[in-house]
Swiss-Prot record:
Skewed-composition ranges (Low complexity): 15-26
Gene: GCS1
Span(s) of short sequence motif Endoplasmic reticulum targeting: 6-12
Sites where a glycan is attached: N282, N552, N570, N633, N662, N730
Organism: Arabidopsis thaliana (Mouse-ear cress)
Tissue spec: Constitutively expressed in roots, stems, leaves, flowers and siliques.
Protein name: Mannosyl-oligosaccharide glucosidase GCS1
Topological domain ranges for the Cytoplasmic compartment: 1-51
């Protein structure tokens, strides 16, 4: 229900009116109304009150029953001995309770641009935060439209962070039609400030072209909302930019008394509206309804300049002719005159703010050059894309709080209509794949994200990985997609919210942890960083062990050393090839008929990586548990056994590695008339099998086939390595001028739709994460001794050049880094601003690869 309808409902709660000329006491004789006959009145009142009391008791019992029933269904009213295992936290000290994540570190990261789903937003790393954000009126098809949440459908020419250091500074550009909005965020710390310090936002709005003769106007909406429901106090009804600049003030336990100001040297018109609501995910609806009401009443496109009692949200409309600039400083920890409010305001507005932003810009450039050392290798355009990649990766980091929904069969919850339990309330600090489309945490993406982030800021990486590991349940399982909080839930269809505890996801966090271990061995860290990584591993090792054991037991296959991704649907008639969502490769073709006989070569290699990583941790930490160390060592030996790998997955005719399972190539989607539940006749695409499946290698060459190559299990002198190099470089199979395609052009599933509505996803398009991993192994084989060293180097050099050139070209043609790239033309596809693993382009530029 929208805010306007909530207010209307509240307005309808009035005392019952009486009919004209009626008197409330007219049912009684005058003598009784004057106080005579008190006994009659008392008895009548007693009977009435008794009925009401009984009714209230019955109603209360009913309410309590339903509340308790719901709490039990959602796992909120179990004692620890009765709580279902799936929603029971892992019984070990939390990683995030380490001292390294407290004190100055925690405070330094308290405030940030941790709302990746909106075009610009600020919040604190606390469940019920003070939240700030920006909206504006855009124009589409000659109509005003509200811009707030990042949406692909908004079709902005470009948007994203141009600079961001992940801690206290960021500069973003948003371009819509002929208008450019630049948002800058910077933090200030010092003695006497509130927890987390002060911060400021600068918003520059200008014409895209140099022609200032076209004086168009812009309407911005800057808002403050307190998720905890704390009352906000309006500074003044009308803003005088030359005088008082106070927008709104308030008080919170975390930061004390605070104020938000707005200052500008331009002629601007301002209006406001205040709301009282527990929800902030529908703020744009509140604004649009308020504007629409004002337009109908007065013909003006402006907020109402009114506020509800005890408002916890204030929205300020700032309108003016382009160009204009506004500065919005946040001052906290105010304690009387000693707080130097005016001095702090001066330091975060006007020229002092310009100087601070310039300093942060210079620091960003210096750190970028120090971390990636690209200046002598690439032209300015390529360097620009590299800066955009790291800036958007860091600027896309978000903070979320809520409870995941975990699937449980209804049969385990008698009388329940729900098929889920609620995970425990948890917070998550994480990078996200894409602000417009995937603005939340994804487990298998995060390992790739951290390969880039740790090279910029190791402490941010440890903080993020620690948050993920603290989501581990008692069985060693982590939900693969984190949809936490009302704002996140509002962006995801209900059918995709529930997480399945039998399903895994590639354990890519081992990828970055292994990288950190190798960095220690290669002495890439200063002493303090090394100590923190070791402390982190000491605390995290028990959780990593439990995570590994969950995979090693729940995803194991029938044969020793075999594994398969659980969760494939063996009953579906709607899919050409049942998806394997848990693998992260969704529609990549596997065995046509899912069964427990399957062996998935990619999961086998992930398990090799995980076991090798755990073995390295036990060695690095000098663990005394020899049994655990030997178990990991034996698992590493088993999974790196080249002969066993070949027996299970190698096809000597193709010279390639494949999955194994119950498979036939004779399947296709055909149109069939189907009677719906409502009796209507419709046509649907359904799968038809024309041949009996049998157990065999699944002949679909693609990314999955190269996991043994990516894992570097293949000896550098093996002829099988040459086979892999030939397959990679064959233009008729995987090679393109833009990168390696995800599925061989010779595959029967190449670019085939999986359902009527599912376009090919991992069946041809070029993906940067897999190209990065293959490229890293090409680099490896090009520097180790072996007969295929030069061949590896030649392929590596050309593939690297193709990948960089295509990403850079697309960025300057479209304004974005993309989720995937077309297998024929190289054009960007999928969601835009996909600066999750597509940002690995920067590591390709710097030739910085993990030791898989």
């Amino acid at each position: 229900m929208t805010g306007a309808s909530r207010r209307s409902a509240r307005g309808r709660i009035k005392s019952s009116s009486l009919s004209p000329g009626s008197d409330e006491g007219s049912a009684y004789p005058p003598s009784i109304r004057r106080g005579k006959g008190k006994e009659l009145v008392s008895i009548g009142a007693f009977k009435t009150n008794l009925k009401i009391l009984v009714g209230l008791i019955i109603l209360g019992i009913i309410v309590i029953y339903f509340v308790i029933n719901r709490l039990v269904r959602h796992g909120l009213l179990f004692d620890e001995s009765q709580k279902p295992r799936v929603i029971t936290p892992f019984p070990a000290p939390k990683v995030m309770d380490l001292s390294m994540f407290q004190g100055e570190h925690k405070e330094s990261l308290y405030w940030g641009t941790y709302r990746p789903h909106v075009y610009f937003g600020v919040r604190a790393r606390t469940p019920l935060s003070l939240v700030a954000g920006l909206m504006w009126l855009g124009v589409k098809d000659e109509m005003y439209v509200m811009r707030h949440f990042c949406e692909n459908s908004d079709d902005l020419s470009t948007f994203g962070w141009r600079e961001h250091n992940g801690r206290d500074y960021g500069r973003q550009e948003l371009v819509e039609n002929d208008m450019v909005i630049e948002t800058s965020f910077v933090k200030s710390k010092g003695d006497g400030l509130g927890y987390g310090g002060d911060w400021a936002v600068r918003i520059d709005v200008k014409n895209k072209g140099l022609n200032d003769d076209v004086k168009r106007s812009a309407h911005l909406f800057f808002y403050l909302a307190d998720e905890g429901g704390n009352v906000l106090n309006l500074g003044q009804d009308g803003l005088d930019f030359q005088g008082s600049s106070l927008l709104v003030s308030g008080s919170r336990e975390d930061v004390g008394d605070w104020q938000i100001h707005l200052k500008s040297q331009n002629q601007l018109e301002t209006h406001y509206s205040g709301f009282k609501t527990p929800h902030i995910y529908n703020l744009s609806d509140l604004v649009q309804q308020n504007l629409a009401l004002q337009a109908r009443k007065f013909g003006r496109l402006q907020l109402s300049d009114t506020s509800e009692d005890s408002s916890n949200i204030y929205i300020f409309q700032i309108s003016g002719r382009l160009p204009f600039t506004i500065d919005i400083p946040f001052i906290s920890g105010i304690k009387g005159e000693s707080s130097n409010v005016e001095k702090r305001l001066t330091s975060l507005t006007g020229l002092p703010l310009s100087d601070l932003l310039k300093k942060k810009h210079q620091e960003f450039d210096a750190k970028f050059n120090e971390c990636f050392k690209l200046s002598e290798k690439h032209d300015s355009e390529t360097l620009g894309v590299g800066r955009t990649a790291i800036a958007n990766m860091l600027g896309g980091i978000g903070y979320f709080y809520g409870q995941s929904k975990i699937y449980v069969p209804k049969s385990t919850q008698p009388g329940s209509r729900d098929n889920f339990l609620l995970y425990w309330p948890a917070e998550l600090y994480t990078a996200v794949p894409s602000r417009p489309f995937f603005p939340r945490g994804f487990l298998w993406d995060e390992g790739f994200h951290q390969l880039l982030i740790w090279r910029w800021d190791i402490r941010i990486t440890l903080d993020i990985v620690g948050h993920w590991l603290d989501l581990l349940n008692i069985d060693g399982w982590i939900p693969r997609e984190q949809i936490l909080g009302a704002e996140a839930l509002s962006k995801v269809p209900e059918e995709f919210v529930v997480q399945y505890p039998s399903n895994g996801n590639p354990p890519t966090l081992f990828l970055v942890i292994r990288d950190l271990i190798d960095a220690i061995r290669m002495e890439k860290f200063v002493a303090s960083e090394k100590d923190e990584v070791l402390s982190f591993l000491e605390r995290a090792s028990v959780r990593l062990d439990a995570w590994f054991q969950w995979f090693n037991t729940s995803q194991k296959g029938k044969e020793i050393g075999s594994y398969f991704w659980h969760g494939r649907d063996n009953t579906t008639t709607q899919e050409l090839n049942p998806k394997t969502l848990s693998s992260g490769l969704d529609d990549y073709p596997r065995a046509s008929h899912p069964s427990e006989d399957e062996r998935h070569v990619d999961l086998r290699c992930w398990m090799y990586l995980a076991a090798d990583c755990m073995h390295s941790i036990t060695e690095l930490l000098g663990k005394e548990d020899k049994l655990s160390k030997e178990n990991y060592n034996s698992t590493v030996k088993l999974l790196s056994n080249f002969n066993l790998l070949n027996q299970m997955h190698y096809d000597s005719d193709y010279g390639a590695y494949f999955d194994f399972g119950n498979h036939t190539e004779k399947v296709k989607l055909i149109w069939k008339e189907v009677i719906q539940e409502n009796g209507q006749l419709s046509r649907q695409l359904v799968r038809k099998t024309f041949g009996k499946p049998k157990l065999k290698l699944v002949p679909h060459l693609g990314y999955v086939s190269f996991f043994p190559f990516m894992s570097r299990i293949i000896p550098p002198d093996s002829p099988i390595l040459e086979k892999q190099l030939d397959l990679i470089s064959n233009r008729s199979i995987l090679w393109s001028d833009y990168g390696l395609v995800s599925l061989a052009k010779t595959s029967s599933m190449y670019m085939k739709r999986n359902t009527e509505h599912d376009a090919p996803y991992w069946r041809g398009p070029i993906w940067m994460n897999m190209n990065y991993m293959i490229l890293s192994s090409l680099y490896h084989y090009s520097i180790v001794d072996g007969p295929y060293r030069e061949k590896s180097k030649a392929i590596y050099t050309e593939l690297r050049s193709n990948l960089i050139r295509n990403v850079v070209r697309n960025y300057y043609e479209t304004g974005y880094i993309w989720e995937q790239y077309d297998q024929v033309k190289g054009t960007g596809k999928g969601t835009r601003l996909f600066t999750g693993w597509s940002a690995l382009t920067l590591l390709i530029m710097s030739e910085d690869y993990p030791i898989f």
